[in-house]
């Protein structure tokens, strides 16, 4: 393939114009070089079919130079490798569709003529490098390439296909119907006036003159509405708008239902928590009553003994008071008991009081021991209840953890040992089975510890960081929720 004119070492001008070859399948012949149709730029064959990708021209130092120019270039004296120029983009397509029987002949381009002196794209060859120099020649080549790549493509000079007019808008149809309705109302009132003014010819003629333009305007307004295409396009647009409104309403209903469902779930959770709290309070009160009843049953015997002791003390006090009254009555009669009788009575009273006091202390010690025993049993019962509650909470947490792990790593029951992801599961769960691995993981985490008042510091999450819920319905359809 011959080099373009601006790559040739010495060329006087463009080649003479050749007759255009026959164009197959109705494609017009390529235009001749002229001011209206610049010549196509040459292409270098590449390894792929079709036009090669546009590349910029190589630097001037890498382009081949003539021997004379190389000998004239001073300084350096290095050898230049014969690097071929990069491919240039193809010209804009000049073909049109296959003409039909009613197609007109495509106008021929004007004959070639001298182009404007400021346009370097025409068929005239640029001056040799000796006249322009390396920098000017490089600028000329860059300008030609930029004009070929980024220039406005020239449209073929044939008949343009008329653009299909856009369909009627709903606002236009609505305005047309409203204006037609107003005209109908006006014409109806004029018709009533015409029927009333049949006897008066002048008034009837005046009213008829007013109704004629309104009738013509109404016919003009209703003319598009009689066309099936116009009405069909309006109906399609109206159906499209209705469909869009239905889609928006369904999306809004889904959002509202989801919000209501979330609120309903939250209220149900609050009600469940309140019910659990009430049940726990009732159970605690019932348990306290049962423990109190059991304690009363155990301490009943001791309390009976204590009550007997108090009754004996009261009896002794009453006996002492009775003897004092009898002694006073005998003294009034002149009978005085001997002093030994008083000493014997006081001796028996002191002995009985000591015995009752000793029994009371013994009963109190027994009551304290029983109370301590009952408190220990009650504490043991509370501890068992707390352990049972903690066991339930732990089972619940383990079940939740198992569910989270099944979501992240799959169900362990359905996870065979020879599964492809088993090494990954062992790697991420190695801290649960190996103490050195746990220490190493905690050591790796502790390397990122910062003071509590650090602005960018935060606590290490206690569990798995689960992804958030889908943000919209379209994303939710791509996720299988369990």
UniProtKB/Swiss-Prot annotation:
Induction: Upon induction of apoptosis in embryonic stem cells by treatment with dexamethasone, staurosporine or C2-ceramide. Residues 49-71, 151-168 have a biased composition (Low complexity). One of its GO terms (biological process) is apoptotic process. Residues 1-136, 151-170 are annotated as: Disordered. It comes from the Eukaryota. Keywords: Apoptosis, Coiled coil, Nucleus. Transmembrane segments: none annotated. The keyword Coiled coil applies. Highly expressed in testis, thymus and lymph nodes. Detected at low levels in embryonic stem cells. The keyword Nucleus applies. Pfam families: PDCD7 (PF16021). Residues 13-48, 82-100, 109-130 have a biased composition (Pro residues). One of its GO terms (cellular component) is U2AF complex. It is found in: Nucleus. Residues 233-408 form a coiled coil. InterPro entries: Apoptosis_promoter, PDCD7. Promotes apoptosis when overexpressed. Interacts with RBM40. Component of the U11/U12 snRNPs that are part of the U12-type spliceosome. This is Programmed cell death protein 7. It comes from Mus musculus (Mouse).
